[in-house]
Amino acid sequence: LVEDCALTFGSKYKSIIVGNYGDAAIFSTDHTKPLNTLIGGFVYTNDIDIATSIRAMRDDCGDLSNEHQRLILKTYIDEHRIETVNHKIYIMRNYKKALMNKLHIHNEISPYLELETSAKIAINPYYSYPAKLPSVLAKIGLHVLEQYKANIHQRQSWLKEILQVVEKKEDMPAAYYDTGCDIIPLRIAYSTHFALTVFSYIDDWIWFKTPIVATKENICDFGYHWGGCPVAEKIGKSIMNLPVIIDSKQQNIFLRNIKKTYSYGI
């Protein structure tokens, strides 16, 4: 049993931290995740045999070229600087990237390792895949982890305030009210009511709408059969990102808008 814990990182169920229920746990750290190293991830296990096998697989992986690593670092810095300073510039940057992709104006090397998104197995000539996580990204990951630790209490208090505003349990899944769940909110499941509230004043930046993402191909081409992962299919339509990094001023604005909308009975 392998747990995918990237979006439940640090949360507990019945006092056990997620990632300890199965034989191993995976935590991707791409730029959609709370621990953002742009690309990459890590594996956690208490099973010595599994750990030994994974290390052997890692040692057999190639390294990304110096050019590719520099491109990844530059992209990480650009995204972090633009997103935290001016959201409008960040959005315009994404539009520009989308247009260039549409016109097929782009570099052969992508920092996101996007050539592995096809159902057709092929070895690309531009980089090793899978590849070892560059040391610079591991260093960034350690720094981000420290930031994340300092942010946990704020996130939990934020969720508590949201639930106090919503009040009625039918607006949120029962798990948010379960005392056996110690949730560090990174995504939030919403009802239609909550969706109308939040999406009325912020961009709805939703990820993972289907069980297989980050591909332009039909997911059935990967061997997926609809109904095979009913939970993933259901919650994919009702999950919204909460900002990974948010200051108290932004948090107050978020809560104020929710309170305002609910007071009108929308």
Residue ranges and their predicted role:
Residues 4, 29, 41, 155, ...:
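Generic structural signal for small/hydrophobic residues in well-ordered secondary structure
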Residues 45, 190-194, 244-246:
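Short beta-strand-to-loop capping motifs
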